A protein has these predicted regions:
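Glycine-rich, charged/polar anion/phosphate-binding loops
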Residues: 18, 118-119, 170-171
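C-terminal charged capping/lid subdomain of soluble metabolic enzymes
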Residues: 46, 52-54, 143-193
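Active-site segments that bind and position negatively charged phosphate/pyrophosphate groups
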Residues: 68-166
């Protein structure tokens, strides 16, 4: 996950009192080193979790990348390209909105609901798995079947046993909300941001 998302952007945060990423700061690193070869040391579940962030980037900002992921015969062999394209998207967004006042909010696609799932799951699910699940209710109904196919291809979950009531307390404490309002990003079609 960190190779395609949190490694750049300068946003740091910690969980507190069961709420995901509630305390944080913005500070740009001097350098970021990314080596896709290190991914060979990870179990497949971790690779899948990282791919969720690339699917997020593709859905919001690069329809061609989504096609590439969807058509790929071997996602593992395609990881260097998928990582590079995901990082380019993130870099472009962060450069335009370094402090998350506008466009950068698109990077939160899947994260509002995903963080609620992650907090309520109590560590049973990886961050990327929760982001994958969080994207599903936030995309247009016509896009959802395609997203389900892509997530399954990436080895990610597409269903979870929970209730809206179980997630609401976590949604209300999401750092992106203002007052009682919950702020979430919706995607109508791939690459629309």
């Amino acid at each position: 996950e960190s190779q395609v998302d949190s490694s750049i952007g300068g946003k740091t945060a910690i969980d507190m009192d069961g709420v995901k990423n509630i305390v944080g700061a913005f500070h740009q690193p001097r350098a970021v080193l990314i080596d896709p070869d290190t991914l060979r040391t990870l179990p497949p579940r971790q690779i899948s979790a990282g791919l969720a962030e690339s699917v997020k980037m593709a859905l919001t900002s690069d329809a061609d990348l989504l096609d590439r992921i969807e058509r790929s015969a071997d996602l593992t062999a395609g990881l260097p390209e998928i990582i590079a394209r995901s990082l380019t998207i993130k870099k472009n967004v962060v450069e335009q909105d370094p402090h998350e006042h506008g466009l950068r909010r698109v990077l939160n696609f899947g994260h509002t609901v995903g963080h609620a799932i992650e907090s309520s799951a109590g560590g049973r699910l990886l961050h990327g798995e929760c982001v994958a699940l969080g994207m599903l209710p936030m995309c247009a109904p016509a896009l959802r079947p395609r997203l389900i196919r892509v997530l399954r291809k990436c080895g990610l979950p597409t269903e979870i046993e929970t209730t809206r009531e179980a997630l609401l307390p976590y949604l209300r404490h999401d750092k992106k909300g203002q007052g009682a309002a919950v702020t979430a990003v919706e995607v109508d079609e791939p690459g629309s941001f």
